[in-house]
Regions:
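A Zn2+-metalloprotease active-site environment signal
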Residues: 6-21, 29, 36-218
Length: 218
C-alpha cells in the first residue's frame, strides 16, 4: 500500500531506548508468559482462528491496573522509515474514524500509538515485546514494539505493508469498541458468564476488531 501522500499523526509516542518495567503484561489481575502464548497458538490451530487474534484476545480484557509512570517520549528519528510508516497509518485511521463518528453525530477521540522496545509501563500494567501489539483501555493507547513486524513476516508468514498497517488498524478497532461502550458491555457479560462463554465473547471482540479494521482498509 502507498502512504507517500499521507500526513503523519501527532499522536505518536516514541519510548524506545527508555527501558521499562518487568514481569510481564498484567491485565485483569493476571500475567501471561510465553507458555500461555504457545498454548494460544496451538489452540488457534485447532480452532481455525488467526494466531494474532488469539494472542490479542489473551492480552485484552479485564479491568486496567493502576497506571505506572511512563518515560517522556522523544522525537522519531528522521531516518526511521518504519516509525514514520506507522505514524502515517495511525493518521489514516484517525481520518477514517473522525469522519465516521462525525457522520453519526459523535466526536472521535484519537488514541495514542506508543513505540517501545523490550518493556514499557502502561495503565494496564507492564507491556512487553513478547505479548505483541496491544491496546490498553485504561490510557487509550496502542502499544507496539516494531520488532514485531519481523515476527509477522517470519513466524506468521504475513509480509507486506498492508499486513503491517492492519495490525495498527486492528488495535485501533479495540479503541473504537472502547469509545462506543462495547468493551464495557462485553466485560460485564464476561463477569456473569462461565469460562467457555467468556472466552467466546473475547473471540467475538477480536473478530469485531478485525471487522472494524476492515472498515478502515476498504
Amino acid at each position: 500500500m502507498r502512504m507517500d501522500d499521507q500526513r503523519e499523526s501527532d499522536n505518536l509516542e516514541d519510548r524506545r531506548g527508555d527501558g521499562g518495567g518487568g514481569g510481564g503484561l498484567r491485565l485483569g489481575g493476571g500475567r501471561m508468559g510465553l507458555g500461555t502464548i504457545a498454548i494460544a497458538l496451538v489452540a488457534s490451530y485447532f480452532l481455525g482462528i488467526n494466531p494474532l487474534t488469539v494472542i490479542n484476545m489473551l492480552s485484552g480484557g479485564g479491568m486496567p491496573a493502576m497506571e505506572q509512570s511512563a518515560p517522556a517520549p522523544h522525537p522519531v528519528p528522521a531516518n526511521d522509515p518504519m516509525a514514520h510508516f506507522v505514524s502515517k497509518v495511525l493518521a489514516s485511521t484517525e481520518d477514517t474514524w473522525r469522519e465516521i463518528f462525525r457522520a453519526n453525530g459523535k466526536q472521535y477521540e484519537d488514541p495514542k500509538l506508543v513505540l517501545f522496545s523490550g518493556a514499557t509501563p502502561t495503565a494496564c500494567g507492564t507491556g512487553q515485546t513478547a505479548m505483541g501489539p496491544f491496546y490498553c483501555p485504561g490510557d487509550h493507547k496502542v502499544y507496539i514494539d516494531l520488532a514485531f513486524y519481523q515476527e509477522l513476516k517470519t513466524r506468521f508468514h504475513a509480509p507486506g505493508e498492508f499486513a503491517e498497517a492492519y495490525v495498527i488498524a486492528h488495535e485501533v478497532g479495540h479503541h473504537v469498541q472502547n469509545l462506543l461502550g462495547i468493551a464495557d458491555k462485553v466485560h460485564q457479560a464476561q463477569q456473569r458468564a462461565g469460562k467457555v462463554e467468556a472466552n467466546a465473547l473475547s473471540v467475538r471482540m477480536e473478530l469485531q476488531a478485525d471487522c472494524l479494521a476492515g472498515v478502515w482498509g476498504k
